[in-house]
């Protein structure tokens, strides 16, 4: 419990310091802050997103789909990619979890030791949903200023990614989140490197997400 308390404190400090570097979180802490993954807030081609509740803040935890050919080497590459991406119009990456445990499972009539892998990414919580849902719900009376702010923010975020030589590959309204001030924040860039064509269910070709 003492280790979890110190981890939780470190995570909360990262949220208050924009220059703090992401660190590794334990799977036990992730399960604790998500109440054992009880509140799903998003579902995409790469994983399920759950709400994480800290003492004074909220976070979003993405639990990645793990297939047999999932590459940990590419997972490390993508964590490094997320660490590099620091911009007001990019969803902020906070921490990651890479947990591997052995588990006895029954196979062909006997028990064998199986490897159970969990790979998770922790991001800032962006409260106002995604651009796709916003567009569906807008009325003709919506102010042009708000729309212009969104367009401008998306352009700034995309320009930054390209400057950092990071290719998004799947920019669409679902992958643009809106914060409390309706500022757009781009998410889900680069993760395609972790998945092949069949797994991602989003991309039409297998192109690296970073160069």
Indicate where each model-derived feature is located.
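Pre-DFG segment of protein kinase catalytic domains
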Residues: 185-188
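A short helix-coil junction within the Rossmann-fold of NAD(P)-dependent oxidoreductases
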Residues: 160
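Catalytic-loop of the protein kinase fold
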Residues: 166-178
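Membrane-proximal cytoplasmic juxtamembrane segment of single-pass receptors
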Residues: 1-154, 163, 199-200, 204-211
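Helix N-cap/beta-alpha junction loops of NAD(P)-dependent oxidoreductase domains
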Residues: 194-195
């Amino acid at each position: 419990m003492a280790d979890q308390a110190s981890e939780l404190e470190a995570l909360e400090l990262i949220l208050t310091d924009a220059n703090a570097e992401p660190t590794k979180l334990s799977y036990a802490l992730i399960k604790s802050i998500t109440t054992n993954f009880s509140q799903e807030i998003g579902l995409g081609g790469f994983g399920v997103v759950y709400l994480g509740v800290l003492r004074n803040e909220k976070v979003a935890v993405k639990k990645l789909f793990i297939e047999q050919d999932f590459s940990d080497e590419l997972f490390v590459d993508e964590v490094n990619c997320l660490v590099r991406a620091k911009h007001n119009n990019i969803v902020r990456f906070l921490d990651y979890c890479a947990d591997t445990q052995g588990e006895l499972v029954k196979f062909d009539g006997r028990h064998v030791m199986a490897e159970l892998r969990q790979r998770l990414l922790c991001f800032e919580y962006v409260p106002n949903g995604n651009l796709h849902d916003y567009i569906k719900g807008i009325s003709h009376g919506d102010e042009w200023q708000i729309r212009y702010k969104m367009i401008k923010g998306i352009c700034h975020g995309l320009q930054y990614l390209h400057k950092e030589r990071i290719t998004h590959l799947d920019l669409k309204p679902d992958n643009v989140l809106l914060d409390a001030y309706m500022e757009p924040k781009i998410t889900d860039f680069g993760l395609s490197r972790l998945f092949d064509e069949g797994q991602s269910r989003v991309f039409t070709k297998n192109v690296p997400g970073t160069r």
